[in-house]
Curated annotation (Swiss-Prot):
Name of the protein: Large ribosomal subunit protein uL14
PROSITE patterns: RIBOSOMAL_L14
SUPFAM superfamilies: Ribosomal protein L14
Keyword rRNA-binding: yes
Pfam families named among the record's database cross-references: Ribosomal_L14 (PF00238)
Subunit structure, as described in the record: Part of the 50S ribosomal subunit. Forms a cluster with proteins L3 and L19. In the 70S ribosome, L14 and L19 interact and together make contacts with the 16S rRNA in bridges B5 and B8.
């Protein structure tokens, strides 16, 4: 469950290490986001020489969440950390590599490029 002020680890090589959620997109009353939701975030820490810098406002898609998401067969999938991938306006990732597993629910939201770059899809 991602809300305002939530810190997320960045799971790509765009240069950011940690981001903080500013807003969950998808309606003015929307308070929480989960796997597959797009958020607006601020970069809190970054590596030198990266594409994004500290203080940049970016869009990101949540790929791992501590709060589980329920699947159609009744099972739940949850992770040990909250993580996101920084994206462009056309839903393409800014980085060229994805680190760690991602959830299969991203396919329903049409983030196929992230799924193809990920080392493991759960």
């Amino acid at each position: 469950m991602i809300q305002q002020q939530t810190l997320l680890k960045v799971a790509d090589n765009s240069g950011a290490k940690e981001i903080m959620c500013i807003r969950v997109l998808g309606g003015s009353k929307r308070k929480f986001g989960n796997i597959g939701d797009v958020i607006v975030a601020s970069v809190k820490s970054a590596t030198p020489g990266g594409v994004v810098k500290k203080g940049d406002v970016v869009k990101a898609v949540v790929v791992r969440s501590v709060k589980g998401v329920r699947r159609a067969d009744g099972s739940y999938i949850k992770f040990d950390e909250n993580a996101a991938v920084i994206i462009k306006d056309d839903k393409q990732p800014r980085g060229t590599r994805i680190f760690g597993p991602v959830a299969r629910e991203l396919r329903d939201k049409e983030f196929t490029k992230i799924l193809s770059l990920a080392p493991e899809v759960l």
